[in-house]
């Protein structure tokens, strides 16, 4: 069974269930000291808990940034640690690739939301500049 993590309307991460669970657990471990509720949400989204579904499409920019930061940190820990117990050596490279794909999707979503926020701020400033004109 595959897990499904909706990042945006256009970005959806769908790895094998064991990869989905493994990655969410690793991110939750890093995330827990900073945001225990969000870490619990990740853990509650594993395949054995709810069938492996998590929807991040409506999270705010700050939460998305925190997820990206902790995902990158968890990825770095996994990459430095190398092959560990419970992961077959032949699947390790695929796990890293899938994990990196999620990090890339989170980064893309963050950049898109930052650009949207900047455009809205520019539009807002332009509207108020018109109000101040003589």
Cite the ranges covered by each PLM segment.
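Acidic (Asp/Glu-rich) sequence patches and key acidic residues
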Residues: 1-134
């Amino acid at each position: 069974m595959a897990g499904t993590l909706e990042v945006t309307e256009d970005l959806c991460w769908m790895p094998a269930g064991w990869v989905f669970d493994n990655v969410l657990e690793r991110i939750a471990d890093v995330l827990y000291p900073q945001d225990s509720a969000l870490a619990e949400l990740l853990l509650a989204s594993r395949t054995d808990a709810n069938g492996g579904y998590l929807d991040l499409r409506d999270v705010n920019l700050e939460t998305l940034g925190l997820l990206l930061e902790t995902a990158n940190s968890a990825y770095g820990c996994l990459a430095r640690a190398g092959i560990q117990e419970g992961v077959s050596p032949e699947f390790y490279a695929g796990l890293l690739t899938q994990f990196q794909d999620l990090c890339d999707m989170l980064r893309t979503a963050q950049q898109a939301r930052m650009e949207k926020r900047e455009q809205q701020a520019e539009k807002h400033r332009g509207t108020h500049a018109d109000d101040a004109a003589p």
